[in-house]
Amino acid sequence: MKNNQANEKSKGFSDGERAAMKERAEELKAEAEKADGESALLAKIAQMQEPDRAMAKRLHAIIKGSAPALTPKTWYGMPAYAKDGKVVCFFQSAQKFKSRYATVGFSDEANLDEGNMWPTSYALKNLTAAEEAKIGALVKKAVSRAMRP
């Protein structure tokens, strides 16, 4: 009879074990989505012409370094970075829209608020160390929640 009781107990998982397995499944799903989004983003960057491709590659590194919690994805066919599924910042190539400059933009999810008016997009013709530093600081500020309600 003792064997039957032991077998009955071992047939199922405890609540704690089930919760841990559910958490792990969610982690694996999130990792897979992040990997898929990054693959799609890198494929879009590879399709760009120079100098947009070089700027987009560098921006990808800057954004990942400044806000590793953001998830790379594509948004309207352009590189974008999201938090909790919502786009925070993005890159628009000059060639796609036949513009004289590329654009680095931020959505309303970005915490860039400064008083009653602030910029949400920036023209980008060249990416030097000065612009890299500015963009890195903007991305860090964009993902901070200090000022957001």
Language-model features: where?
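Charge-dense, helix-prone N-terminal extensions
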Residues: 1-149
